[in-house]
Amino acid sequence: MQNMFPWLTVIILLPLVAALAVPLIPEKQVKWYSFAVCLVDFVLMVAAFFTSYDLSNPDIQLAERYRWMPQIGLEWSVGADGLSMPLILLTGFITALATLAAWPVTLRPRMFHFLMLAMLAGMVGVFAVQDMVLFFLFFELELVPVYLMLAIWGGKGRLYAATKFILYTAVGSLFILVVGLAMYFYGDLRTFNMVELAAKNYDPTFQNLCFLGLLIAYAVKLPIFPLHTWLPDAHGEATAPVHMLLAGILLKMGGYALIRMNVGFFPEATQLFAPLLIVLGIVNIIYAALTSFGQRNLKRKIAYSSISHMGFVLIGVGSLSEIGMGGAMLQMISHGLIGASLFFLVGATYDRTHTLILSEMGGIAPKMPKIFAMFTACSMASLALPGMSGFVAELMVFVGMATTDAYSFQFKALVVLFAAFGVILTPIYLLSMLREIFYGTLNHAVVHEEDLVDAEPREVFIIASLLVPIFGIGLYPKLTTDLYAPTTDQLTRVTRERIARAAPPPALLSGVYSVEFADRDRVSLR
């Protein structure tokens, strides 16, 4: 049903229109202007979902459809369901805090805040649009601000990192365009509308090819090994606000699109690729955790930690269970908060120590007790300490994988065993990182004691704002799971039903899927 007030259109266009006015704002006031726009946009998001969104309805709500180019089926189509609504709220929340983190930027501040506002519009658009062409356009729109913010405000290797980022993501985006056009021309109905595309009956070979194409595209963004190498380079050169947007929101676009399109459009192909997603998730978790051990650069260490944590999203999606799919969604939300907080603290620490090399740090805890306490709390969240959001998300993925009836006992046991090994690695490298940064003796040859100023109120506010939902989700996850559960449960159920009507899995996967699932004797969910 068409929504009466165009909430999502206003939410998308507000930061874009406001960005056009940035050149008119005095340079000293532009940071206040940018923060105010992001705050107003976030308030509009909360108001829209509080007043016009039914949590029990799993379908698209706040829908708007306006003809754009009817000759070829293009339209402005936006909407939100349980997959997109939490991520839209996460985008508004983290972007508002990222603009606050950008206050110390003195090089071309107008241009920087212009790009931040444009990026907000692009990121919200990715989660809200219901048209493949619009999705592609917004997916591309958010690439340009990130490239410029890396290339202009990054570190010494910024041009290499920015070029690598744009090449990887642009090539990945081409697969989205090709698959979108292929679906448009498939069958008699010419449409780019996602709901109508999902309703088409694609033959198995077409589904498999399209699933693979989109998987490559989103493997870059998530990222998935071996298409992950742009992320450590980008994080290694980015400033704190860009870190927060990269870790907090951009990586989630890959996970969101994987669920929305790969699973939603091609459920029969999901049967073939679900075990691959699980294996790739295990590789992400263990490979990135082991690689993080060897990183002496603090930013790159946290970047590989992010790659490791996103592996749980792949396992949750591949589990073909309601609990696992819900765990994947919660892991994206949780990591968005934790990743943004950790990278902000990395930036705050670098501003004081002027080094990212762990061997050059040490002994700064007595001089910066607030930063030490906040860094410790956020690291505990990252290693999935009980009572914090990371624990609940990873637990749901484990339970979903262990209890799903889709896979054989042997396969489930191996997955849980390897994933548990990755979980054990996480506290080892995070706790050793804390020891190298804050304990020991101060390296006076590199770090100047007079620069070690403790956290200012702005920095405390940013981290406190992120820790509140981290603890809130950890202590009472139902507040968050209720936002998406009806949609993820329905999506998983429909996927299982479509798989049940399709051909049995190939003989190659005979030892992976359970006998009951392969024989189609039951399709019930656990």
Swiss-Prot record:
Q: Which gene encodes it?
A: ndhD
Subcellular localization, as worded in the UniProt entry: Cell inner membrane
Instruction: Provide a GO biological process annotation.
Output: aerobic respiration
* Lineage of producing organism: Bacteria, Bacillati, Cyanobacteriota, Cyanophyceae, Gloeobacterales
Record-given protein name:
NAD(P)H-quinone oxidoreductase chain 4
One GO term in the molecular function aspect is: NADH dehydrogenase (ubiquinone) activity
Enzyme Commission no: 7.1.1.-
Q: Which InterPro entries match?
A: NADH_Q_OxRdtase_chain4 (IPR022997), NADH_Q_OxRdtase_chainM/4 (IPR010227), NADH_UbQ_OxRdtase (IPR003918), ND/Mrp_TM (IPR001750)
The UniProt keyword set, sorted, is: Cell inner membrane, Cell membrane, Membrane, NAD, NADP, Plastoquinone, Quinone, Translocase, Transmembrane, Transmembrane helix
